[in-house]
């Protein structure tokens, strides 16, 4: 007999984020995974694709009505953008008490959905059952900018580089390893979805220039911030350390963080704090794993809080190593 308190299903579990979710949820003491939906893997054992899972579940092909009929306590939608609405409508009609966590961008601009970036928005959570998980780049940008948001003299300029897992599993130039070899691929250099997302959440215009690199996972985000008045490096670093003092998944470090030290970790590193002459411009670097804190880990934080559990339940975090100085 299971001792789990809550039942949970995942829709869209074939992708990289779905796999990360299964790994985390398998170790969750209060969650029973009752269905995992994937058309491509239909009928195949979940354990054959995820060695951390030891149960008997098989992937299923479930339409929105079938998902709603499962009446799970929690449904996580890990679908490509543009696909969430039919599932939300079916659950709203059949099982409205179900907690829905949407990992796509479909609900991030909907005021009826709680925007779940816990380190910045947990104080606004009041029991909502519809939670929108932030984007991976958007998470890094907001955490890098937020402590200085009210002291900025102009739009933050953010240069982002992600591993190709951020492009998902559907073949495209952005996850074509042959095209990415020895390459850095710029794309959507203005009006990127995450640029609009961050601008909406922070209430200021943000300029974002994304790129894809040959590595598999991990984001490095360099934020160029102009200040209204001169500030010292020590003041700014203290501002960040104070802002995130009670957030165990945020590491404030002295040097610029390295993306190769964030892979497979649940935390965010924020560092560099490099001042331009005159102390009215600072450059800050943030790194995170796009599949974890940029997706699955953040979903688990939101799930835990919504279920009344400790926010970090089943998140095996540890401080990241600090990069060694370049000789």
From Swiss-Prot:
One term under GO cellular component: cytoplasm
Main localization category: cytoplasm
Highest taxon, organism lineage: Bacteria
Gene3D superfamilies in the cross-refs: Dihydrodipicolinate Reductase, domain 2, NAD(P)-binding Rossmann-like Domain
Signal peptide: none
Pathway: Amino-acid biosynthesis; L-arginine biosynthesis; N(2)-acetyl-L-ornithine from L-glutamate: step 3/4
Active-site residues, record numbering mapped to chain: 136
Keyword Iron annotated: no
Segments forming a coiled coil: none
Subcellular location per the Swiss-Prot or TrEMBL entry: Cytoplasm
GO MF annotation list: N-acetyl-gamma-glutamyl-phosphate reductase activity; NAD binding; NADP+ binding
Keywords tagged on the record: Amino-acid biosynthesis, Arginine biosynthesis, Cytoplasm, NADP, Oxidoreductase
Gene Ontology BP, a term: L-arginine biosynthetic process
The EC number(s) this enzyme carries: 1.2.1.38
InterPro entries: AGPR_AS, AGPR_type-1, NAD(P)-bd_dom_sf, NAGSA_dehydrogenase, Semialdehyde_DH_NAD-bd
Reaction catalyzed: N-acetyl-L-glutamate 5-semialdehyde + phosphate + NADP(+) = N-acetyl-L-glutamyl 5-phosphate + NADPH + H(+)
Family as reported in the entry's similarity comment: Belongs to the NAGSA dehydrogenase family. Type 1 subfamily.
PANTHER family linked to this entry: N-ACETYL-GAMMA-GLUTAMYL-PHOSPHATE REDUCTASE, CHLOROPLASTIC-RELATED (PTHR32338:SF10), N-ACETYL-GAMMA-GLUTAMYL-PHOSPHATE REDUCTASE, CHLOROPLASTIC-RELATED-RELATED (PTHR32338)
Protein purpose: Catalyzes the NADPH-dependent reduction of N-acetyl-5-glutamyl phosphate to yield N-acetyl-L-glutamate 5-semialdehyde.
Protein name: N-acetyl-gamma-glutamyl-phosphate reductase
Source organism per UniProt: Xylella fastidiosa (strain Temecula1 / ATCC 700964)
Lineage of source species: Bacteria, Pseudomonadati, Pseudomonadota, Gammaproteobacteria, Lysobacterales
């Amino acid at each position: 007999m299971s001792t789990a308190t809550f039942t949970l299903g995942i829709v869209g579990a074939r992708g990289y984020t779905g796999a990360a979710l299964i790994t985390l949820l398998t170790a969750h003491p209060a969650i029973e995974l009752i269905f995992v939906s994937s058309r491509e893997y239909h009928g195949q054992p979940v354990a054959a694709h995820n060695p951390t899972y030891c149960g008997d579940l098989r992937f299923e092909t479930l339409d929105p009505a079938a998902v709603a009929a499962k009446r799970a306590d929690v449904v996580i939608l890990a679908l490509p953008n543009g696909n969430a609405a039919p599932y939300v409508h079916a659950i709203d009609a059949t099982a409205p008490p179900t907690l829905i966590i949407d990992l796509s961008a479909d609900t991030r601009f909907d005021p009826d959905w709680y925007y779940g970036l816990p380190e910045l928005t947990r104080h606004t959570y009041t029991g909502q059952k519809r939670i929108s998980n932030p984007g991976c780049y958007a998470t890094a940008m907001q955490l890098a900018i937020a402590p200085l948001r009210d002291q900025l003299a102009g739009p933050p300029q953010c240069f982002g580089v992600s591993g190709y897992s951020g492009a998902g599993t559907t073949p495209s130039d952005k996850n074509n390893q042959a095209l990415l070899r020895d390459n850095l691929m710029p794309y959507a250099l203005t009006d990127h979805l995450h640029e609009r997302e961050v601008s909406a959440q922070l209430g200021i215009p943000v300029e974002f220039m994304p790129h894809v690199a040959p590595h598999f996972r991990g984001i490095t985000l360099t934020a160029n911030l102009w200040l209204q008045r001169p500030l010292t490096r020590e003041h700014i670093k203290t501002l960040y350390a104070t802002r995130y003092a009670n957030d165990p998944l945020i590491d404030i470090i002295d040097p610029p963080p390295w993306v190769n030290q964030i892979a497979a970790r649940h935390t965010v590193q924020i560092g560099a704090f490099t001042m331009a002459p005159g102390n009215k411009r600072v450059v800050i670097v943030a790194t995170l794993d796009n599949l974890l804190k940029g997706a699955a880990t953040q979903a688990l934080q939101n799930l835990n809080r919504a279920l009344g559990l400790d926010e970090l339940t089943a998140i095996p975090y540890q401080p990241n190593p600090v990069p060694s100085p370049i000789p």
